[in-house]
């Protein structure tokens, strides 16, 4: 989705700006698919379908938190890395470094999003 792409673009641009300054790094993570209550307001028929399919493709909410926890706490994490589950389609599994979309690596888009973010918020990010 656009919001996920924007998150990655901003993270990569932030890391590019932080790199010359030293130890602070910017990383990103995604949970894969987690069995949560997000489907509680969908029609009952769909809820039943989710209950059948979910164990096959999703992990627990605790499992979904692991990529973020690793990105935030593992001393081996490097700036600009992106963490997600190692399973098929990055849906579930152990947290590992994963690739993001080709578009997320577009430096021009990263810089443009940074500039638009500053413009729309009226804040110049001191990085």
Cite the ranges covered by each PLM segment.
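NAD(P)H-dependent oxidoreductase Rossmann-fold/reductase module
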Residues: 1-127
């Amino acid at each position: 989705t656009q919001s996920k792409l924007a998150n990655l673009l901003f993270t990569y641009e932030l890391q590019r700006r932080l790199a010359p300054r030293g130890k602070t790094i910017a990383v990103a993570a995604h949970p894969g698919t987690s069995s949560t209550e997000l489907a509680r307001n969908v029609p009952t028929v769909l809820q039943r379908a989710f209950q059948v399919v979910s164990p096959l493709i999703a992990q627990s909410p605790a499992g979904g938190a692991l990529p973020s926890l690793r990105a935030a706490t593992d001393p081996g994490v490097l700036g600009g890395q992106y963490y997600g589950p190692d399973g098929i389609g990055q849906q579930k599994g152990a947290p590992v470094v994963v690739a993001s979309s080709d578009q997320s690596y577009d430096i021009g888009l990263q810089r443009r999003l940074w500039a638009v973010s500053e413009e729309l918020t009226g804040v110049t990010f001191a990085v």
